[in-house]
Structures are given as structure tokens and as C-alpha cells.
Amino acid sequence: MADTIIPESLFEPSQLPTPTENLPAVIHDNPGQMLRSFLSSPFISASLPLKDIKKNVFRRKYNNITLSLASTSEKVPYGKYGRLLLTILTTHAVIGNPDDQEGNILVHYDSIRQLLKEMQLSAGRSNEIKEQLEYFSKSTFVFEERRTSVVQKSLFKDMIDVDDCYKKDKLEATLVSSGIIPFMEGMQYIELTEDGKKSNQFCITIKLSPAFVKFSKSHSVPINYSTYKAITSVVGKDIYAWLTYRNNGLGKGESVFIPAHSLVEQFMPVKEGSHENQERTNYYFIVNQIKEIKEKYYPELNISFNQDGMGVTLRKSVAQIEPDDSRYVLVTSNL
């Protein structure tokens, strides 16, 4: 594994921690405390793969957002542990202060076990988290968003040639925003070996890229990490984050109808060549996930299901979490 460790020149000597620097032995003193983390809204609309796709490229499109993941390794981040790690990395990007003028943020852990404690996971999940961490360290995402609105042609009078064929006074203008964003600029750790057997990783330093930091600070929203982690279904995690996000965007007395097809496209897209009833099957799986979330985790959720299976209506509900919600402690609070 030594040949995959980032060269020391990537980090200034002052940025590298000693094995016990700045990290407590216990991350959270109150295991019953609700924890708050952050997740960027594009990853709520178009999330990571649900499972291991065994490819190094993944593309997801939802409405006006297209998200493409690409990795120099054999796989991209995926599944429930990829999602948990993403919200941890995003939270550090949101609340952290850049360590240099370029905008990097360094995150230090004494060992993989301290990262697991921060994530509220048992030591038995170290292999899964190490695996996802490696995928993130070698992955970038391409984010494209298209926003269309109707504008007066006069707004572009200095840019439109007289012979251009725009006849009407009002035009459709689409703003296309895109960027290639690596999650990290590098990662460094020590692996101790005895008799040829690998042990856990120690002295982990993660260097979040300036682009990822800026993106996270601009687009992230708070989520209840305790609930997000407790939901065992990967699709359920995505649905819960989306319900929280959409509800927080509604005003008092407002509601929004989401067609069944849109729900399926967002959370469980149907592959080409699938059975003709697959979309209907996926929709009712999503409905059951929403019902379970309401029953177990979000009883205040005000949502109704169209009896003919055409979609769901979300009405403004009591917010589970607000920005800077005093009921919650940041998942990274003791780092």
C-alpha cells in the first residue's frame, strides 16, 4: 500500500499531525444527543450509486441537474457508507476554515477508529469506511445545472446581431453552470504491518480540495445525521434527506405534488429493457419507504398519497432541522 500514499511534499510539515494532536479519545459524550451534519443539495437531487456498480464512471440526471462521478480507481463511492462519509466530508468543508490561501481544508484523525467514532459506527465497519475513503480520494464529480427563465430580448440588445433571427420580444434564456470538482487534493496515512498482515490506518490526513470546499459552503443544507444514519435502507436515506430539503423550501401553507414518475426517476430509475411494471413496483417501494420514515423518524411529516398511484403531495410540515438548530450538536463538534 506504500506506493499509494500521497508524497509528503503535498503537505507542509506544520500541517501534519502527531498521533495524538488535536483529537479527543471520545468523540461524543452523550450518545443520545441528536447530531447535525451537512449535505450539498445537488447530492440530494442526484445521489451516489445505490450499490457497487463495479465501474469507475457513474452518471445521474434529475430535472435540471446532471451529476457525473469519475474515478481513477476501479470504482466510485456508493451505498450507505459512501453516503455517510460524504456527509462527514461535506460537514468539515462547510464549517472548516481553510488552512492556506488556496482554500484547502485539512482534516486529521489519529486512526480509522477515530473517524468511525465521529461517524457513530462500530470498529467492525473499518473495512467499509477505508474502502469508501479510498474511492473518494480518487474521485471527481462533474456538476451541471441548467436554469431556464423567460427574459426580455432587450436585455441582450448589445450582444445580439441585427441579423439574428429572434423575432419575439421575449426569449427563453438558459443559464448553464458546470464544473469539475475533486473531493480531495490528497490523502495521507500510515499503515503498520506485522508478519505481512496489515493493521488499521493511523495518522490520517485528508486534504479537501478548494473546489469541493467552495461548492459545499455554497450549496449545503443541514440534515439530522442521527436519523440519516439510523435509516438502514440506502434509498430511505436519500428519501429522508430529500423530504427534509423539500419541506424546508416550502412556505407556510404551501404544498407540492410530486408525480410517481418523478419520484422513480430520482430515487430508483428504471433501466432500459426492464419489465413494463418495474416503474410501478419501484414507486410503491418508495411509498413504503416514506411511510416507514414518517412512522419511525418523522411523525410530523405532512404527506399524502394519491389513491390511484399517480404521486404524493407534500405539505409544509414542522421542520425536523433548521440552520444552526440549537437542538442539535454538530457531528464534528469535538474535533
Language-model features: locations:
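Charged, alpha-helix-forming regions
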Residues: 2-335
